[in-house]
Amino acid sequence: MDNFLPFPSSNANSVQELSMDPNNNRSHFTTVPTYDHHQAQPHHFLPPFSYPVEQMAAVMNPQPVYLSECYPQIPVTQTGSEFGSLVGNPCLWQERGGFLDPRMTKMARINRKNAMMRSRNNSSPNSSPSELVDSKRQLMMLNLKNNVQISDKKDSYQQSTFDNKKLRVLCEKELKNSDVGSLGRIVLPKRDAEANLPKLSDKEGIVVQMRDVFSMQSWSFKYKFWSNNKSRMYVLENTGEFVKQNGAEIGDFLTIYEDESKNLYFAMNGNSGKQNEGRENESRERNHYEEAMLDYIPRDEEEASIAMLIGNLNDHYPIPNDLMDLTTDLQHHQATSSSMPPEDHAYVGSSDDQVSFNDFEWW
């Protein structure tokens, strides 16, 4: 046993390798080149190992194992390049007490990782089950809301003209004293005007055509807005003749419609048209709110005339109670009085001087 070496002598240039077939026949041998005995590892690094330390060293530094005639073995390396014929049949390799091919185990790990990634993408692991339920619920509510809006839009065209054109209500206004007066303009509810009527880019406004719902007659109005402290009031101008011909009175309702082609229509309803009490109250509340915000608009012709007159006077004439103006006029009067001739001379002042003097007799 002392002279035993598990590899052939130094003169041997080849070694017989056992080749296994699927039927476990060991009758076939192949010859492969081998190393010189000077290049071979000592026998205590080859199996069987004498001590666990030597076995661990062999695992950390794997070397090819060669067969002897007495103990035929299969050469094994970590890469498995010398026994490629056995890679395709790992079960046979396990039966012999060997290890699996590292390449196959690596591919198996990669396949498992890919499968886990696919499952994570399908189940969205970043979201909890409650979040998934909430997202699905929100999506369902959004779809339901869109369907309701579409159905409401279709159902909003409930009225029609005599030529069967579908109409929907854009704006409704209960006429006030200022709307049917001689000012020739009708104030529209701000909320309805901004939401439904054409958009206005400047104060000049646009010209709109409106057709009577009950006839073929059309009217042309100037649709514009007035600004006041970051707020707006929307009006229809050039309505004087329109009010007269339609016999509009205080308390009547002007309703503006729109057809499916975005054409505008109107209808003038008298006091008998107040059948829907809810709509009437809502319209009154809106009108009261608009008039309260923009209180500077006159309510009748007399107030409008007075406001216009006061504005013109303030722009072109000084305020009578201004002390600076009174002081200036008094100095001018004193200067003209000191330059007048004595009483024994007959001097007739100009009409301007007389007026200026009379103005300050009370001073």
From Swiss-Prot:
Subcellular location, principal: nucleus
Name used for this protein in its record: B3 domain-containing transcription factor LEC2
Record organism: Arabidopsis thaliana (Mouse-ear cress)
Upper lineage: Eukaryota, Viridiplantae, Streptophyta, Embryophyta, Tracheophyta
DNA-binding stretch(es), residue numbering of this chain: 171-272
Biased composition (Polar residues): 8-27
This protein's encoding gene: LEC2
GO cellular component, one term: nucleus
Region Disordered: start-end pairs: 1-27, 331-351
Source superkingdom: Eukaryota
